[in-house]
Regions:
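Non-membrane alpha-helical structural segments and their capping/turn regions in soluble enzymes
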Residues: 67, 104-111, 136-140, 165-168, ...
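Short glycine-enriched loops at secondary-structure junctions
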Residues: 133, 189-195, 315-317
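Acidic-and-aromatic substrate-binding clefts and catalytic sites of carbohydrate-active enzymes
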Residues: 62-68, 95, 133-139, 162-169, ...
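Surface-exposed, active-site-proximal loop segments in enzymatic domains
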Residues: 90-106, 137, 202-205
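Divalent metal-dependent hydrolysis catalytic cores, especially in the metallo-beta-lactamase
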Residues: 15, 57-61, 65, 74-97, ...
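Catalytic pocket-lining loop regions of alpha/beta-barrel enzymes
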Residues: 5, 118, 144-304, 308
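Aromatic-lined substrate-binding rim segments of carbohydrate-active enzymes
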Residues: 74, 78, 101-108, 167-182
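Mid-to-C-terminal alpha-helical segments outside catalytic/metal-binding sites
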Residues: 1-16, 23-84, 112-120, 141-145, ...
Length: 351
């Protein structure tokens, strides 16, 4: 069923899109340089070698839209009834850069730029801090700056950083800063590291089609099984794309995790205070980005609870009015739909 999309809450709720991307020209130019000089990993060559160089309509349109935080983006939000967009620097951010000083500078300048755009469109935009996990101590300070000086409402990290995952103890300063500020961490996909990408790349499955979700789901699962939520019980981690498959897998994840712990198969795998399902229901938040499919949305609400699922568009990578209508037309109670589209985001991002 088609209906006109308007902002302002005419259907009983505002629409807050929670995983929306932007880029800076410096960032795109940096990726191009890395692709050309051979310092990019295979995933960056595949993803940004295409988007930043292809003359195809999809690639050129996405770059144009990523670089625009002005009138075009506001117009697109108006056309699809999006009242507010929660913005973060597009993946992989500053994380692939081999020069740590350059990574810090790129991230800080992107944060300053985003803060200016949020200030200019305060009723439409919300910002998330980008960091350079290559330097965990600096990233911790930048999280605090983002929260307390720039007015940002969360932190986005684009999965692995040059093949390293956040369960490594070296990244603990980042989690200390998240605890100090009370901000959520959004783990956004990135292309898999070279150690994982081979079979995906040779089949064209390394990007958003499959590799993104598999790699990000792995990252979240590593964090859960490492005991991150036992060490930081108030921490909230967000993931997109209906939970990167973990809600569907969770019964078997719990069964096999508990079997491994009991058997002592992996000496480093320790008992947890809760089951994986319980952590999904207490510490993980899920957005619908790129997954405008009623069965998946309803299933995920059933698994993790209606308070833990939030709407997202995934602009500009997916920008379709009918995907907004799919959410509007879900056969759920009005109060549940308002949580999905508006009030869960207001709660968890402290809007």
């Amino acid at each position: 069923m088609s209906h006109e999309l308007k902002t302002g809450g005419d259907r009983g709720y505002l629409r807050i899109a929670t995983e929306e991307a932007f880029a800076t020209r410096e960032q795109i130019d940096c990726y191009l340089r890395m692709v050309k000089d051979g310092t990019a990993d295979k995933g960056m060559v595949s993803l940004w070698g295409f988007y930043a160089r292809s003359p195809s309509e999809r690639a050129t349109q996405i770059i144009e839209r990523l670089l625009d935080l002005g009138s075009q983006r506001i117009r697109h939000m108006d056309e699809t009834g999006i009242d507010r967009a929660i913005l973060a620097l597009t993946s992989p951010g500053a994380q692939p850069l081999p020069d740590i000083a350059e990574a810090r500078g790129l991230a800080a300048r992107a944060n300053d730029y985003l803060a200016g755009q949020v200030a200019a469109h305060r009723d439409r935009y919300v910002g998330m801090t980008t960091v350079a996990p290559q330097d965990p101590e600096w990233s911790a300070r930048e999280i605090v700056r983002g929260a307390r000086e720039l007015g940002f409402k969360g932190v986005q990290i684009n999965s692995h950083t040059r093949g390293q995952y956040l369960d490594h103890p070296k990244f603990d300063p980042i989690f200390c800063a998240l605890a100090d500020t009370g901000q959520p961490l959004y783990i956004h996909p990135a292309t898999p590291p070279d150690s994982m990408i081979g079979p995906m790349l040779e089949a064209g499955l390394d990007g958003a089609i499959f590799g993104f979700g598999v790699e990000t789901g792995l990252h979240l699962l590593r964090l859960i099984t490492s005991g991150i939520f036992d060490r930081y019980p108030q921490l909230q981690i967000m993931v997109g794309h209906m939970g990167e498959a973990l809600p569907f897998w969770v019964y078997r994840l719990d069964y096999m995790h508990q079997a491994s712990v009991r058997s002592g198969r992996y000496p480093f795998m320790k008992p947890l205070q809760k089951t994986i399902l319980e952590y999904l229901r207490s510490n993980v938040l899920i957005t619908t980005s790129g997954m405008a499919w009623a069965p998946a949305i309803l299933f995920t609400q059933q698994v993790v609870g209606e308070d833990r699922v939030m709407y997202a568009m995934d602009y500009p990578y997916q920008f379709h009015a009918d995907e907004v209508r799919t959410h509007d037309n879900l056969a759920i109670a009005p109060a549940t739909k308002k949580k999905l589209m508006q009030t869960n985001a207001e709660r968890w991002f402290s809007l």
